[in-house]
Amino acid sequence: MRRFLFAFLMVVLVAGSLGAQRRQRTYATNDPGFWLTAGIGGFTANGVNDGVTASTWDFGSATNFQYRASLERGMANGSSFGIAGTFARVPFAYSADLTSPLPADASGSRCLSCNAHLDMTTLVATFHSGAGAGFHQLVELDGGIVAYRNLKQDSDGARLAPGGGNIDPLFSAGYGFGYGLSARTNVDFISTYTFGIHERKGLSNGSSNTNRMPSLRLSLRMGFGGRTVTR
């Protein structure tokens, strides 16, 4: 009986050891280890109410071009996670309440009403689902910041308040379709809804602090390297 129990325990231990070794094996997959993406899109924006400078930046819901690039780490099932950034040079109508004084730490000039341009830049953490050969669906989720910089009056190039620009939190969700020319070369077309949340300091209760920015984007995604899994 003792010999039987000893033999049984040895079989259990050996089986457990072999199972642990199998679980620790590393396999190479055909999935890309990284994705590099470049895209161009058109977006609209409603505007920003800035209570600190008593100014409004009206984008007029006009369509403007936006350029995007991302670097993502490949994951399972065609998903990836990484960082992305966009840039757009945006025309807008600047208006300010000149009877409201600027804070002592604010810089830049103001106008009652004038045409101007600014640089709009975003930097986000991005999650992308959908990749591979042939047609496939896409889902994209972003979270990060939007920066409004270089607010300048068109007529004379004067820097408008706030002179240092402004940075707001930004969130985005998108859905679309892609076509894979190969497992590592994809063309994506995606519709996104993005919104930036501006600070409420100095705003009346009825003033909006949300800049809504829907967009359509065409992107080229290229996969590089390889990915391994442990089982």
Where would I find each of the regions flagged by the language model?
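Predominantly the C-terminal beta-signal and adjacent terminal strand-loop region
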Residues: 90-94, 173-231
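Short glycine/proline- and aromatic-enriched beta-strand/turn motifs that initiate or cap beta-hairpins
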Residues: 20-74, 143, 148-150, 213-231
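Positively charged n-region of N-terminal signal peptides that target proteins for export
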Residues: 1-4
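Bacterial N-terminal signal peptides
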Residues: 7-15
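Short acidic, glycine/proline-rich loop/turn micro-motifs
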Residues: 48-53, 95-97, 151-157, 200-204
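Transmembrane beta-barrel strands of outer-membrane/channel proteins
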Residues: 34-44, 83-89, 139-145, 175-177, ...
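Gram-negative (and chloroplast) outer-membrane scaffold detector with strong preference
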Residues: 21-24, 70-158, 168, 215-227
